[in-house]
Amino acid sequence: MPFIKSNVHTHTTFCDGQDSMEDMVKAAVSLGFDTLGFSFHSYTPFDPSYCIRDYYEYMREFERLRKEYGQTICLLNGVELDLYGERPSVCDFVIGSVHYLEENGRRYPVDFSARGFKKLVDGMFRGDALAAAERYYAEVRELAEKVKPDVYGHFDLITRFNQGGAFFDEESARYKSAALSAVESLPAGAVIEVNLGRLFKGEGGMCPSDRLTREMLSAGCRFM
């Protein structure tokens, strides 16, 4: 099977990314990529801080770049859709991700900061971080059922601030049971993103973890 150089989890200055769309295209071309997919954050009305800011301008720029660079690289228009986000009417692919936990109609981010995560655990789960992990993977299962994404993003994001077991024991029966339950909820041949964001930020290894990756391989998942 040939190796395809591609990335579809790409944020730009139209949401919470640091580089323009054209800069990302130029970088992908310079690296010999076959495909680059842009995936703006879907709009979440309860927290618009990181979401797409001007969808129509974004689409105009995307179409301009696809016309200009289309003979060199395949450009795709996608969305990173949260469980509570709004799905655009037109897109080439959907990355499904869980960024929030819900309690009594309110949503709390799981990956904003370690301090914020502790506040979530203390406020929502009375200090029981494993309960937070169980809720997270329950929402991953719900994502698989309701959103049915083309790609599953940063599958075990709940562990982002858990280096060295700072909040919970990833070897515990409770954690492994919750995570495995989420893996078992995936459809046959599900595509899982290998996300290196934590590795580059010095916050741990790749996402998903080695253990979950092995479970996913056994379940017939695919990776990108």
What residue ranges belong to the model's regions?
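A structural motif
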Residues: 33, 91, 148-149, 221
